[in-house]
């Protein structure tokens, strides 16, 4: 049975941990508000651009740019796995890594060649245990401040576009956590190249009208497709950032509650041990007095 001193030290240690988790919860809540606002603000543009491209693609048939139609094969797949740079966020990183592993297994069972580009340190650490041989690159987001992912998304988009044009892969799929609400972040796999509109993207109703484009549909697509890919990556980074903070806030809230329960249980154990020690000392005093 632990001594009173041990119990007292443990209570103090848990109280210190509780203060840390509470502080982390408050910081995550503040960051979540900003991240959620940024993700929400980016959605209308991304959705509208996806709708415009969907309408343009419908008029070009099979003769469009390769970023839209592909290069005629789907043998080599590049998985872009986006997770957080930091842990202590519940199952946020683990769920994305799990989806990535399932996707890798599925593609390999179909005889496909798989490559992995990681964005964020935590996902890379998890996948490295089994799939480090598939890694082709890594993007570090630790220097990004205040959800300003514009430069990072542009860099990744250019990397993917150039890699596709150089024949390094045939299909690129982005795996990230889509932010639904504070309690729900959904691991999602979205094909980036060849470009496809995200599931649930709005469609522009032309009312039966036929638009004439100047310049041509092909020229517009050539200009818009790289921007569309960059926009989808930026949106995913913002969604992932909001989901990370929401998951961390929830995890730290649970940790704070658990610490409170543990302190209560330890205090009860401490009081019982102290009472038992006092009772024992009283018995010894009484026994000694009777012996006299």
Swiss-Prot record:
Intracellular or extracellular location(s): Cell inner membrane
A single MF term (Gene Ontology): proton-transporting ATP synthase activity, rotational mechanism
Domain of life: Bacteria
PROSITE patterns per UniProt: ATPASE_GAMMA (PS00153)
CDD domains documented for this protein: F1-ATPase_gamma
Keywords: ATP synthesis, Cell inner membrane, Cell membrane, CF(1), Hydrogen ion transport, Ion transport, Membrane, Transport
GO cellular component: plasma membrane; proton-transporting ATP synthase complex
Keyword Cell inner membrane assigned: yes
First and last residue of the signal peptide: none
Bilayer topology term: Peripheral membrane protein
Coarse class of the protein's main subcellular location: membrane
InterPro entries registered for this protein in UniProt: ATP_synth_F1_ATPase_gsu (IPR035968), ATP_synth_F1_gsu (IPR000131), ATP_synth_F1_gsu_CS (IPR023632)
GO terms (BP aspect): proton motive force-driven plasma membrane ATP synthesis
Subunit structure: F-type ATPases have 2 components, CF(1) - the catalytic core - and CF(0) - the membrane proton channel. CF(1) has five subunits: alpha(3), beta(3), gamma(1), delta(1), epsilon(1). CF(0) has three main subunits: a, b and c.
NCBIfam families: ATPsyn_F1gamma, PRK05621.1-4
Summary of the function given for this chain in its UniProt record: Produces ATP from ADP in the presence of a proton gradient across the membrane. The gamma chain is believed to be important in regulating ATPase activity and the flow of protons through the CF(0) complex.
Stated family: Belongs to the ATPase gamma chain family.
UniProt-listed HAMAP family: ATP_synth_gamma_bact (MF_00815)
Name of the protein this chain belongs to: ATP synthase gamma chain
Gene name linked to the record: atpG
């Amino acid at each position: 049975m632990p001594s009173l001193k041990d119990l007292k030290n443990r209570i103090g240690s848990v109280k210190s941990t509780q203060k840390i988790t509470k502080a982390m919860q408050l910081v995550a809540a503040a960051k979540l508000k900003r991240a959620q606002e940024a993700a929400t603000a980016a959605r209308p543009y991304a959705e509208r651009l996806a709708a415009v491209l969907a309408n343009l693609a419908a008029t070009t048939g099979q003769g469009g740019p390769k970023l839209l139609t592909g290069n005629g094969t789907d043998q080599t797949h590049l998985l872009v796995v986006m997770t957080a740079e930091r842990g202590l966020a519940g199952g946020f990183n683990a769920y994305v890594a799990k989806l990535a592993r399932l996707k890798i297994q599925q593609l390999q069972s179909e005889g496909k060649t798989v490559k992995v580009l990681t964005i964020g340190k935590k996902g890379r650490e998890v996948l490295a245990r089994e799939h480090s041989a598939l890694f082709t690159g890594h993007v570090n987001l630790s220097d990004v401040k205040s959800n300003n992912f514009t430069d990072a998304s542009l860099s990744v988009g250019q990397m993917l576009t150039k890699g596709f044009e150089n024949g390094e892969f045939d299909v690129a799929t982005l795996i990230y956590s889509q932010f639904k609400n504070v309690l729900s972040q959904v691991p999602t796999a979205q094909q980036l190249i060849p470009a496809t509109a995200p599931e649930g993207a709005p469609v522009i109703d032309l009312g039966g009208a036929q638009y004439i484009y100047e310049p041509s549909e092909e020229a517009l697509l050539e200009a818009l497709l790289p921007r569309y890919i960059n926009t989808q990556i930026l949106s995913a980074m913002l969604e992932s950032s909001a989901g990370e903070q929401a998951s961390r806030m929830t995890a730290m809230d649970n940790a704070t509650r658990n610490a409170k329960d543990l302190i209560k249980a330890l205090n009860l154990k401490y009081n019982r041990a102290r009472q038992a020690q006092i009772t024992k000392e009283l018995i010894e005093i009484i026994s000694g007095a009777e012996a006299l």
